[in-house]
Amino acid sequence: SEMCIRDSPYKHAKGEGNYQWNTGYEYYLYGYDQRSMGYIDILVPTSDSDGQIVRIICTHFDHCGIDQVIQQQEQNVVTQAGLNNPEYPTILMGDLNVGWGTNVLPEFRNLGDHIGVSWVDHIFAFPKGRWTGHDFKSHSCPAANGKASLSDHDPITATLVLK
């Protein structure tokens, strides 16, 4: 019932820099996962005494296989993080549940540079043309001591340089 959902201990923290979608009651009825986007603004040291603020976004899109759902989540991120006109240089990474050759992420591809992908895990940099990226890697993380792995995805890394 709705009361059980409201009283559930499984809640996401929300506030500045944290946004969710798929939160309506109808989503619980049909078994959709809640998905979210979080970001943090960090001050990166530079040769300039003031440094540079960079926004880092992490997100996880639905794995429903429906392009329109993925595109709606992409639009949510573009809107919530201000990617049309980013306040700061921005790096977005996460499980977007679409592969390399997809045309499902038109907003990200139009507004930013696609740094790399491993399976469905992507790194994008915004605004377009402000970053160079190299050394994109997926790191194998086998289970330790016979225990289950923490995730079905291996971590990804890249070196990004702000121009």
Spans of features found by a protein language model:
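Second-shell loop/turn segments in exported
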Residues: 26, 61-67
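His/acidic metal-ligating clusters that form di-metal
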Residues: 34-57, 67-105
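A structural signal for well-ordered alpha-helical scaffolds and beta->alpha junctions
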Residues: 6, 33-35, 70-75, 116-117, ...
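Structural signal for conserved beta-strand scaffold positions within catalytic alpha/beta enzyme cores
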Residues: 12-14, 58, 110-112
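Structured beta-strand-rich core segments of catalytic domains in phosphoester-bond hydrolases
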Residues: 1-2, 6-53, 135-140
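Active-site micro-motifs of SAM-dependent methyltransferase domains
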Residues: 5, 63, 98
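Metal-dependent phosphoester-hydrolase catalytic domains
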Residues: 81-91, 96-163
